[in-house]
């Protein structure tokens, strides 16, 4: 049920100059505003070309007006779109005209929020709009579109329906003890529960892949000066993103580059060489490098394989281990194999540490090994056509639902406690409901929609 009565307006197209710009309105004043601006009564879902006029009848622009009466519109309310020339001054004049007619400026994401509140789409679909706009690769855009079309929501709804059926069976047995249903002897509850757990595990895995394509991972390149860190960044980026010289300390600040490997986004950070220095600026760069190391998903510790001290790379900089105690997330890169004559390849020690020997000067000397290794570190798989976009909050909700099902199963098998199982099933259903918005606090909704673009 729609309780929003204000009419909102915003420029729906990106800032800057363009061939076409769109001002969008939603609310009860949309039809009246369209008539005032165009001077005619707009036929629903028809394109009307003509002048857009101000309050004095002067022409502001010429373009197309489209009116979509609710509830058959994106927001579920009356919607007006004014498509004119995409100059910022023209768009601003047209927007100001709408505000003069009683509209107010829309908040970021408010159009999508109204669509959600009016049951035109659920929360996961609304978030997919933002993900589609922000997609940084073809596969990420395809996944976001599938989520917008309801692929993710359908999977969640399927899990929810299965949980509801299971809850009905369990709670009926609790409420009618005279039926004397033995949960364990019956076996029906455990079979249903395990089926839900299996499907939930599949959705978790697919959602994890979707989140990878959306968020990617942060990879920090660290090491001594002149180890070849910037050359490695340039090879991964496929361009001269960093300055490369023989002068130690050329890189004095963190340099960030956004790249893709088979569609997976990587945020690669090149850092200042790790060494003791009296240079104030370089010292700041080293401090920032250590900070980046501590925040990374994966660290590539680059060593010059021709240097005498390369035999014990972790001893080169003791503070490195202080910043990154989980050495399992550090990959040792023995660089300059073209000079040292070392065999190009990848080795994994008994304790799980990975060493890759390569040359950052030559793309065919170990770079493909590194790319495959980075994909494997994040558990990346070539995305199937059925995949969808997901966010970290979705993964957390799925994790919580899984934890409740695991706990409920343990309560049933160890103690035969049907009442405790029923409560865990309820909480699992609520966790899934947070994904689609069936159970979401106002604070959560506010945070989600405030991250959208204005006009969306």
Curated annotation (Swiss-Prot):
Transmembrane segments: none annotated. Its cofactor is K(+). GTP binds at residues 226-231, 245-251, 270-273, 335-338, 359-361. Mg(2+) binds at residues 230, 251. GO terms for biological process: tRNA methylation; tRNA wobble uridine modification. The keyword S-adenosyl-L-methionine does not apply. GO terms for cellular component: cytosol. (6S)-5-formyl-5,6,7,8-tetrahydrofolate binds at residues 24, 81, 120, 456. Residues 216-379 form the TrmE-type G domain. Exhibits a very high intrinsic GTPase hydrolysis rate. Involved in the addition of a carboxymethylaminomethyl (cmnm) group at the wobble position (U34) of certain tRNAs, forming tRNA-cmnm(5)s(2)U34. Homodimer. Heterotetramer of two MnmE and two MnmG subunits. Belongs to the TRAFAC class TrmE-Era-EngA-EngB-Septin-like GTPase superfamily. TrmE GTPase family. This is tRNA modification GTPase MnmE. The lineage of its organism: Bacteria, Pseudomonadati, Pseudomonadota, Gammaproteobacteria, Pseudomonadales.
